[in-house]
Amino acid sequence: MQVPKCEICDDDFSSEEDGDHNPRNLKCSHTLCEGCIKKLLKNGRVVCPFCREPTEVPVYNIKSLHKNFSLIQMIKIVTKTTEVEKNWDNFPPKCVEHPYNVAEFACIESNCSSKNKLMCQTCEEFGAHKGHAKELLITKTDKFRKKLEFWINQLKLNIQNCTVKKNELEEAVVKSEQLLNIKVKKIKNHFDKIRQSVDKKEKGIIDETTAEATRIQKFNNEKITYLIDLQARHVKDIEAIEKQKNMTDIDLYNTGIDLPCFFGHLNIEVFRPADTKEMDIKLPNFKFEDGS
């Protein structure tokens, strides 16, 4: 049987002297718990949520409403019956061989061949368990319960240990992640400095090589320009010599020739390209993954 409930809050009514779950009657005979009546109390009256009939509550005193004693008595009976049923469930069972007896003993004989280890006094004296060592069923189950309680405590202890270890591991994971971030930042800073240094070194070598190449190109271009001008002057000299060569004998004899005027341009130095040894560079040694 179940304890009756308040139809408003769905909580069990109580048979205790005081408390919000005591059943009290309204004027219309409907029953509510004190807690719900307190919530419904307004302007010194309670309007029944079922029939809407108002009930006056003098001086807001809910205790002035009559308790539903018949319901309280019923609650006490139900509570007592429930306790008896619980105790009865734990009573020793009837003996299978002798149903008129209670099987209050458990056979603990090591060589017992009977499948049913529960026995009564008759089983011990005249039945299948005659002369067998026995133990009270309640004593045996108490030992079981103590062992079960021990296992429960051990499991709870293991749960606590698991929680401690889990927390330690979670903390280690967080610390490891933090350390990783620090290490990664340090590594990036290190290689950033290397890249900056390499970039600076690369720019310096390129600028130095470019400047030397520019100087060599300027030198060679100046000599090329000079030789082009010299070629043009020689072409004019050839034209002048051809003109003189084609003169009549008398004119050529009278004019004569001025050899220094022509051959002064022939004594030129040999122009060689500028030396490119200064463009040889020595790159910093670095071990690449391909072995180069």
Swiss-Prot record:
<feature type="zinc finger region" description="RING-type">
    <location>
        <begin position="6"/>
        <end position="52"/>
    </location>
</feature>
<keyword id="KW-0479">Metal-binding</keyword>
<dbReference type="GO" id="GO:0016740">
    <property type="term" value="F:transferase activity"/>
</dbReference>
<feature type="binding site">
    <location>
        <position position="98"/>
    </location>
    <ligand>
        <name>Zn(2+)</name>
    </ligand>
</feature>
<dbReference type="InterPro" id="IPR001841">
    <property type="entry name" value="Znf_RING"/>
</dbReference>
<protein>
    <recommendedName>
        <fullName>E3 ubiquitin-protein ligase trim-21</fullName>
        <ecNumber>2.3.2.27</ecNumber>
    </recommendedName>
</protein>
<feature type="binding site">
    <location>
        <position position="95"/>
    </location>
    <ligand>
        <name>Zn(2+)</name>
    </ligand>
</feature>
<comment type="function">
    <text>E3 ubiquitin-protein ligase which catalyzes 'Lys-48'-linked polyubiquitination of ced-1, promoting its proteasomal degradation to maintain appropriate ced-1 levels for apoptotic cell clearance. Acts together with E2 ubiquitin-conjugating enzyme ubc-21.</text>
</comment>
<dbReference type="InterPro" id="IPR013083">
    <property type="entry name" value="Znf_RING/FYVE/PHD"/>
</dbReference>
<keyword id="KW-0863">Zinc-finger</keyword>
<keyword id="KW-0963">Cytoplasm</keyword>
<dbReference type="InterPro" id="IPR017907">
    <property type="entry name" value="Znf_RING_CS"/>
</dbReference>
<keyword id="KW-0808">Transferase</keyword>
<dbReference type="GO" id="GO:0008270">
    <property type="term" value="F:zinc ion binding"/>
</dbReference>
<dbReference type="GO" id="GO:0016567">
    <property type="term" value="P:protein ubiquitination"/>
</dbReference>
<feature type="binding site">
    <location>
        <position position="129"/>
    </location>
    <ligand>
        <name>Zn(2+)</name>
    </ligand>
</feature>
<keyword id="KW-0833">Ubl conjugation pathway</keyword>
<dbReference type="InterPro" id="IPR052667">
    <property type="entry name" value="E3_ubiquitin-ligase_RING"/>
</dbReference>
<dbReference type="InterPro" id="IPR000315">
    <property type="entry name" value="Znf_B-box"/>
</dbReference>
<dbReference type="GO" id="GO:0005737">
    <property type="term" value="C:cytoplasm"/>
</dbReference>
<feature type="zinc finger region" description="B box-type">
    <location>
        <begin position="90"/>
        <end position="137"/>
    </location>
</feature>
<keyword id="KW-0862">Zinc</keyword>
<comment type="subunit">
    <text>Interacts with E2 ubiquitin-conjugating enzyme ubc-21. Interacts with ced-6; this mediates interaction of trim-21 with ced-1 and is required for ced-1 ubiquitination. Interacts with nck-1; the interaction is required for ced-1 ubiquitination.</text>
</comment>
<comment type="similarity">
    <text>Belongs to the TRIM/RBCC family.</text>
</comment>
<dbReference type="Pfam" id="PF13445">
    <property type="entry name" value="zf-RING_UBOX"/>
</dbReference>
<dbReference type="InterPro" id="IPR027370">
    <property type="entry name" value="Znf-RING_euk"/>
</dbReference>
<feature type="coiled-coil region">
    <location>
        <begin position="152"/>
        <end position="179"/>
    </location>
</feature>
<feature type="binding site">
    <location>
        <position position="123"/>
    </location>
    <ligand>
        <name>Zn(2+)</name>
    </ligand>
</feature>
<keyword id="KW-0175">Coiled coil</keyword>
<comment type="pathway">
    <text>Protein modification; protein ubiquitination.</text>
</comment>
